[in-house]
Amino acid sequence: MAHKKGGGTTRNGRDSESKRLGVKVYGGQAINAGGIIVRQRGTKMHPGENVGIGKDHTLFALTDGKVAFVTKGALQRHYVTVVPA
């Protein structure tokens, strides 16, 4: 007869894959049309001039240019704009 006890069980051992969210192109950097600027959940940042928004709230450039981050309005919302080169 073996003298080893049975191994216990655990309810841990799972983790979700990271979603790689965040700012991909920073202020002052050049970007091409269609390039992703910010990946986010919800509208932490809003699209400004020459910036579009995808169905998953991704902000992307509509024209070539330089990225600029602006805070404006009574609610101090963060807007992302692309200044044409």
From Swiss-Prot:
GO terms for biological process: translation. Pfam families: Ribosomal_L27 (PF01016). InterPro entries: Ribosomal_bL27, Ribosomal_bL27_CS. Residues 1-21 are annotated as: Disordered. Transmembrane segments: none annotated. Keywords: Ribonucleoprotein, Ribosomal protein. GO terms for molecular function: structural constituent of ribosome. One of its GO terms (cellular component) is cytosolic large ribosomal subunit. PANTHER family: LARGE RIBOSOMAL SUBUNIT PROTEIN BL27M, RIBOSOMAL PROTEIN L27. NCBIfam families: L27 (TIGR00062). HAMAP family: Ribosomal_bL27 (MF_00539). Belongs to the bacterial ribosomal protein bL27 family. This is Large ribosomal subunit protein bL27. It comes from Janthinobacterium sp. (strain Marseille).
